[in-house]
Amino acid sequence: MHNMLLFIIFHVVGDFYLQSDEVAKNKENLNTFMLIHSIIYSIPFVLLFIYFKINVSLLIIITLSHLLIDVCSVKLKNKYKEKECLIFCSDQFIHIFIIYLCSSYMNLTIILSNMALISILAILILVKPTGVLISLAFKVIFKEEKSNHELKIGTYIGYLERIIIFLLCIFDSISTIGFIIAAKTLVRYKDINNNKNHFQEKGL
């Protein structure tokens, strides 16, 4: 369990946090950016493998499989743009399955407890991966385009909100979550009135 959690944490860091917007965008063209992403993605695993002196063959499997899966995902996205959200979820599932298989061959001594690793993983997933998933879902449902400035502001606010709600859940402060939702609704009341159907659909 320790191994799998640690490997998934490194996967999330490499696939989402070490990938810049420029690399993510240009990856769609199947050019050198795809290779750049795979190399950068492998950095956390390289450090792990050096520290624990693990067989390098597993590192090669993780890196090459990641590159191959990403290439297939990009080709599918270019062909089936309306199914981008489903392809993203399938892509991540296969990545994690490969990582699970590789991690099962190792027995690492890790100081952190399972709960600590789960908490770290939960926060990491709640920020960028969840943001990407929500963005893809809205892209399918709502066809209009937003400015980069508006998207970035909304994205960062979403990051902060999810982290705050997660921490409040950990500290068993459920009532505060209700207060945050009520306060946000009050602040956005004007938007709800001005664009009733559209805004309410997104809010729900």
Which residues are covered by each model-predicted region?
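Generic, well-ordered alpha-helical segments
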Residues: N31, L35-I43, Y51-I60, L64, ...
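Interhelical loop and helix-boundary elements at the membrane-water interface
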Residues: V12-S38, I69-L168, V187-L204
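Short hydrophobic alpha-helical segments that form membrane-spanning helices or hydrophobic packing faces
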Residues: E22-V23, P44, C102, G178-A183
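Short alpha-helical packing/oligomerization segments
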Residues: R162-A182
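Hydrophobic core segments of alpha-helical transmembrane domains in multi-pass membrane proteins
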Residues: N3-V12, N55-L67, L117-L124, S175-T185
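Helix-coil boundary and interhelical linker segments in multi-pass alpha-helical membrane proteins
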Residues: M1-L5, F45-L59, L101-I118, C169-S175
